[in-house]
Protein backbone atom coordinates (compact mmCIF):
# COMPACT_ATOMS: atom_id res chain seq x y z
CA UNK A 1 0.00 0.00 0.00
CA UNK A 2 1.22 3.51 -0.84
CA UNK A 3 -0.27 6.96 -0.43
CA UNK A 4 -0.96 9.19 -3.42
CA UNK A 5 -2.26 12.74 -2.92
CA UNK A 6 -3.47 15.37 -5.36
CA UNK A 7 -0.67 16.73 -7.49
CA UNK A 8 1.07 13.34 -7.83
CA UNK A 9 2.61 13.50 -4.36
CA UNK A 10 3.59 9.92 -3.55
CA UNK A 11 4.30 8.82 0.04
CA UNK A 12 4.39 12.34 1.48
CA UNK A 13 6.06 12.50 4.91
CA UNK A 14 5.23 14.78 7.83
CA UNK A 15 8.25 16.98 7.00
CA UNK A 16 6.85 17.64 3.53
CA UNK A 17 9.18 15.31 1.61
CA UNK A 18 7.59 13.23 -1.14
CA UNK A 19 8.34 11.58 -4.47
CA UNK A 20 6.77 13.56 -7.32
CA UNK A 21 6.96 14.26 -11.03
CA UNK A 22 9.78 16.41 -12.42
CA UNK A 23 7.58 18.49 -14.72
CA UNK A 24 10.55 20.02 -16.54
CA UNK A 25 11.74 16.57 -17.60
CA UNK A 26 8.44 14.84 -18.26
CA UNK A 27 6.01 14.25 -21.13
CA UNK A 28 8.95 13.04 -23.22
CA UNK A 29 7.57 11.28 -26.28
CA UNK A 30 8.89 7.77 -26.85
CA UNK A 31 8.22 5.07 -29.42
CA UNK A 32 5.34 3.47 -27.53
CA UNK A 33 4.36 6.08 -24.92
CA UNK A 34 5.69 8.94 -22.81
CA UNK A 35 8.48 9.20 -20.24
CA UNK A 36 7.84 10.98 -16.92
CA UNK A 37 10.80 11.66 -14.64
CA UNK A 38 10.55 11.33 -10.86
CA UNK A 39 12.24 13.77 -8.50
CA UNK A 40 13.61 10.93 -6.40
CA UNK A 41 13.88 7.16 -6.27
CA UNK A 42 10.68 5.46 -5.12
CA UNK A 43 11.94 3.31 -2.23
CA UNK A 44 9.83 1.39 0.26
CA UNK A 45 11.39 2.17 3.65
CA UNK A 46 9.53 0.07 6.22
CA UNK A 47 10.31 2.41 9.13
CA UNK A 48 9.26 5.55 7.25
CA UNK A 49 6.09 3.94 5.89
CA UNK A 50 5.00 2.41 9.18
CA UNK A 51 5.83 5.36 11.45
CA UNK A 52 5.11 8.30 9.16
CA UNK A 53 3.49 7.87 5.74
CA UNK A 54 0.93 5.27 6.82
CA UNK A 55 0.70 6.42 10.43
CA UNK A 56 -2.38 8.54 9.88
CA UNK A 57 -6.13 8.36 9.57
CA UNK A 58 -7.27 6.25 6.62
CA UNK A 59 -10.77 6.90 5.27
CA UNK A 60 -12.21 4.78 2.47
CA UNK A 61 -15.58 4.37 0.78
CA UNK A 62 -17.34 1.02 1.13
CA UNK A 63 -17.89 0.74 -2.62
CA UNK A 64 -14.16 1.20 -3.27
CA UNK A 65 -13.32 -2.09 -1.53
CA UNK A 66 -14.48 -4.69 -4.09
CA UNK A 67 -12.51 -4.03 -7.32
CA UNK A 68 -15.32 -5.66 -9.30
CA UNK A 69 -17.57 -2.65 -8.65
CA UNK A 70 -15.10 -0.21 -10.21
CA UNK A 71 -13.82 -2.47 -12.98
CA UNK A 72 -17.35 -3.23 -14.20
CA UNK A 73 -18.60 0.37 -14.14
CA UNK A 74 -20.96 -0.05 -11.19
CA UNK A 75 -19.25 2.43 -8.91
CA UNK A 76 -19.49 6.03 -10.16
CA UNK A 77 -22.37 4.98 -12.46
CA UNK A 78 -25.05 4.39 -9.82
CA UNK A 79 -25.94 8.01 -9.06
CA UNK A 80 -29.49 9.16 -9.81
CA UNK A 81 -30.14 6.37 -12.32
CA UNK A 82 -33.20 7.09 -14.48
CA UNK A 83 -36.12 4.69 -13.89
CA UNK A 84 -34.07 2.59 -11.46
CA UNK A 85 -33.27 2.40 -7.78
CA UNK A 86 -29.65 1.33 -8.00
CA UNK A 87 -27.82 -1.90 -8.74
CA UNK A 88 -27.72 -5.31 -7.16
CA UNK A 89 -25.25 -8.18 -7.48
CA UNK A 90 -25.20 -11.88 -6.66
CA UNK A 91 -23.73 -13.02 -3.31
CA UNK A 92 -20.51 -14.26 -4.94
CA UNK A 93 -20.07 -11.50 -7.54
CA UNK A 94 -17.27 -9.73 -5.64
CA UNK A 95 -15.41 -12.86 -4.57
CA UNK A 96 -13.59 -12.63 -1.23
CA UNK A 97 -13.96 -8.84 -1.10
CA UNK A 98 -17.70 -8.81 -0.40
CA UNK A 99 -19.98 -11.77 0.26
CA UNK A 100 -23.49 -12.14 1.68
CA UNK A 101 -26.10 -14.82 2.32
CA UNK A 102 -28.92 -15.82 -0.04
CA UNK A 103 -31.59 -14.42 2.31
CA UNK A 104 -30.17 -10.91 1.89
CA UNK A 105 -31.08 -8.24 -0.64
CA UNK A 106 -28.22 -5.96 -1.69
CA UNK A 107 -28.84 -2.46 -3.08
CA UNK A 108 -26.04 -0.23 -4.38
CA UNK A 109 -27.13 3.29 -5.17
CA UNK A 110 -26.13 6.92 -5.06
CA UNK A 111 -27.54 10.42 -5.29
CA UNK A 112 -26.04 13.86 -5.75
CA UNK A 113 -28.38 15.13 -3.05
CA UNK A 114 -27.76 12.42 -0.46
CA UNK A 115 -25.73 12.92 2.72
CA UNK A 116 -23.15 10.28 1.85
CA UNK A 117 -19.37 10.26 1.51
CA UNK A 118 -18.60 10.27 -2.25
CA UNK A 119 -22.35 10.18 -2.95
CA UNK A 120 -23.05 6.46 -2.71
CA UNK A 121 -23.73 3.69 -0.22
CA UNK A 122 -24.47 -0.04 0.03
CA UNK A 123 -27.74 -1.01 1.70
CA UNK A 124 -28.18 -4.57 2.95
CA UNK A 125 -31.82 -5.54 3.47
CA UNK A 126 -33.88 -8.43 4.83
CA UNK A 127 -32.11 -11.13 6.89
CA UNK A 128 -28.62 -10.05 5.92
CA UNK A 129 -25.34 -11.63 6.93
CA UNK A 130 -22.49 -10.10 4.95
CA UNK A 131 -18.71 -9.78 5.11
CA UNK A 132 -16.40 -7.09 3.70
CA UNK A 133 -12.66 -7.40 3.26
CA UNK A 134 -11.21 -4.13 4.58
CA UNK A 135 -8.00 -2.38 3.54
CA UNK A 136 -4.73 -3.72 4.96
CA UNK A 137 -3.12 -1.51 7.61
CA UNK A 138 0.34 -1.69 9.24
CA UNK A 139 0.84 -3.27 12.68
CA UNK A 140 -0.05 -1.02 15.59
CA UNK A 141 -2.93 0.19 17.72
CA UNK A 142 -5.86 1.41 15.62
CA UNK A 143 -9.40 2.65 16.16
CA UNK A 144 -12.02 1.51 13.66
CA UNK A 145 -15.15 3.50 12.76
CA UNK A 146 -18.18 3.15 10.50
CA UNK A 147 -19.63 6.20 8.74
CA UNK A 148 -23.36 6.19 8.02
CA UNK A 149 -26.47 8.31 7.61
CA UNK A 150 -29.06 7.70 10.35
CA UNK A 151 -32.61 7.08 9.12
CA UNK A 152 -35.82 5.76 10.65
CA UNK A 153 -35.94 2.81 8.26
CA UNK A 154 -32.50 1.51 9.25
CA UNK A 155 -32.13 -1.47 11.56
CA UNK A 156 -29.81 -3.14 14.05
CA UNK A 157 -26.87 -5.34 13.18
CA UNK A 158 -24.32 -7.31 15.15
CA UNK A 159 -20.72 -6.49 14.23
CA UNK A 160 -17.92 -9.06 14.04
CA UNK A 161 -14.33 -7.91 13.46
CA UNK A 162 -11.94 -10.60 12.24
CA UNK A 163 -14.46 -13.19 13.38
CA UNK A 164 -14.83 -11.85 16.92
CA UNK A 165 -18.14 -10.41 18.11
CA UNK A 166 -17.87 -6.70 18.96
CA UNK A 167 -20.07 -5.25 21.70
CA UNK A 168 -23.83 -5.01 21.48
CA UNK A 169 -25.71 -4.62 18.17
CA UNK A 170 -25.47 -1.18 16.59
CA UNK A 171 -28.77 0.57 15.81
CA UNK A 172 -28.56 2.79 12.72
CA UNK A 173 -31.86 4.48 13.58
CA UNK A 174 -30.10 6.27 16.46
CA UNK A 175 -29.51 9.89 15.47
CA UNK A 176 -32.44 10.07 13.05
CA UNK A 177 -34.08 12.76 15.20
CA UNK A 178 -32.23 16.01 15.90
CA UNK A 179 -31.31 16.30 19.57
CA UNK A 180 -31.12 12.53 20.12
CA UNK A 181 -29.35 12.27 23.49
CA UNK A 182 -27.93 8.88 22.56
CA UNK A 183 -25.50 10.49 20.09
CA UNK A 184 -25.14 13.84 21.86
CA UNK A 185 -25.06 15.77 18.56
CA UNK A 186 -25.26 19.56 18.97
CA UNK A 187 -24.72 22.02 16.13
CA UNK A 188 -21.34 23.75 16.33
CA UNK A 189 -22.99 27.16 16.03
CA UNK A 190 -25.07 26.41 19.14
CA UNK A 191 -21.98 25.95 21.31
CA UNK A 192 -19.61 28.48 22.87
CA UNK A 193 -16.44 26.75 21.61
CA UNK A 194 -17.45 25.78 18.05
CA UNK A 195 -18.25 22.23 19.10
CA UNK A 196 -14.96 21.25 20.78
CA UNK A 197 -16.52 19.98 24.01
CA UNK A 198 -19.44 18.47 22.12
CA UNK A 199 -16.98 16.38 20.10
CA UNK A 200 -15.57 14.99 23.35
CA UNK A 201 -19.04 14.26 24.71
CA UNK A 202 -20.05 12.44 21.54
CA UNK A 203 -16.91 10.30 21.66
CA UNK A 204 -17.83 9.26 25.21
CA UNK A 205 -21.13 8.01 23.79
CA UNK A 206 -19.38 6.15 20.97
CA UNK A 207 -20.19 8.58 18.15
CA UNK A 208 -18.59 11.35 16.10
CA UNK A 209 -19.84 13.98 13.69
CA UNK A 210 -19.09 13.47 10.00
CA UNK A 211 -15.93 15.02 8.46
CA UNK A 212 -16.10 18.73 7.71
CA UNK A 213 -14.26 18.21 4.42
CA UNK A 214 -17.21 16.28 2.93
CA UNK A 215 -20.03 18.28 1.35
CA UNK A 216 -23.78 17.76 1.60
CA UNK A 217 -24.98 19.17 -1.73
CA UNK A 218 -28.71 19.05 -0.96
CA UNK A 219 -28.46 21.55 1.92
CA UNK A 220 -25.20 23.12 0.67
CA UNK A 221 -23.41 22.57 3.99
CA UNK A 222 -20.44 20.52 5.23
CA UNK A 223 -21.46 16.97 6.10
CA UNK A 224 -20.38 17.71 9.68
CA UNK A 225 -23.29 20.14 10.02
CA UNK A 226 -25.91 17.48 9.19
CA UNK A 227 -27.11 15.80 12.37
CA UNK A 228 -27.90 12.48 10.69
CA UNK A 229 -24.37 12.09 9.28
CA UNK A 230 -22.50 10.17 11.97
CA UNK A 231 -19.45 8.05 12.64
CA UNK A 232 -19.91 5.07 14.94
CA UNK A 233 -16.80 4.07 16.91
CA UNK A 234 -16.63 0.27 16.71
CA UNK A 235 -13.57 -0.46 18.86
CA UNK A 236 -9.81 -0.15 19.22
CA UNK A 237 -7.56 -2.99 18.06
CA UNK A 238 -3.92 -3.98 18.33
CA UNK A 239 -2.70 -5.47 15.04
CA UNK A 240 0.47 -7.54 15.21
CA UNK A 241 0.84 -8.25 11.51
CA UNK A 242 0.42 -6.27 8.31
CA UNK A 243 -2.65 -7.39 6.40
CA UNK A 244 -6.32 -7.02 5.54
CA UNK A 245 -9.14 -7.47 8.03
CA UNK A 246 -12.68 -8.79 7.78
CA UNK A 247 -15.83 -6.98 8.87
CA UNK A 248 -18.98 -9.07 9.23
CA UNK A 249 -22.46 -7.76 10.04
CA UNK A 250 -25.53 -9.85 10.79
CA UNK A 251 -29.15 -8.74 11.10
CA UNK A 252 -30.76 -8.90 14.55
CA UNK A 253 -33.82 -6.86 13.59
CA UNK A 254 -37.06 -7.17 11.64
CA UNK A 255 -36.63 -8.38 8.06
CA UNK A 256 -37.77 -5.05 6.63
CA UNK A 257 -34.94 -3.07 8.21
CA UNK A 258 -31.67 -2.32 6.45
CA UNK A 259 -28.00 -1.84 7.32
CA UNK A 260 -26.34 0.99 5.44
CA UNK A 261 -22.60 1.08 4.84
CA UNK A 262 -21.13 4.30 3.50
CA UNK A 263 -17.47 4.59 4.52
CA UNK A 264 -14.94 3.39 7.09
CA UNK A 265 -12.01 4.85 9.01
CA UNK A 266 -8.87 3.52 10.67
CA UNK A 267 -6.85 5.91 12.83
CA UNK A 268 -3.77 5.28 15.02
CA UNK A 269 -4.87 5.48 18.66
CA UNK A 270 -2.07 7.91 19.54
CA UNK A 271 -3.45 10.42 17.03
CA UNK A 272 -7.00 10.58 18.40
CA UNK A 273 -6.33 13.25 21.02
CA UNK A 274 -5.07 15.78 18.47
CA UNK A 275 -7.17 14.60 15.54
CA UNK A 276 -8.23 17.38 13.19
CA UNK A 277 -11.90 17.58 12.34
CA UNK A 278 -11.55 19.16 8.90
CA UNK A 279 -10.12 16.31 6.88
Predicted segments with their positions:
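Extended non-catalytic domains of envelope/secretory-pathway proteins
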Residues: 1-3, 7-11, 25-26, 36
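Extracytoplasmic
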Residues: 5-15, 41-279
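Short acidic, Pro/Gly- and aromatic-enriched capping/linker segments at domain boundaries
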Residues: 11-29
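Well-ordered beta-strand scaffold positions
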Residues: 17-19, 34, 164
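FKBP-type peptidyl-prolyl cis-trans isomerase
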Residues: 27-44, 259
Amino acid sequence: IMEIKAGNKINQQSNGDYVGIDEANSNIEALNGYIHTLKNILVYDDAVMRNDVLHKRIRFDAMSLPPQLTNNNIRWHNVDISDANGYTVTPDYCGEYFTFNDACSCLMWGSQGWAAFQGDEINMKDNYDFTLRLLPVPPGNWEFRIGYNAEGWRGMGQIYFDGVITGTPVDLKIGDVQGDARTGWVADESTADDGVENDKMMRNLGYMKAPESCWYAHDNIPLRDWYKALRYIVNQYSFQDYGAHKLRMRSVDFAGREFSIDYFEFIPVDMIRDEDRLY
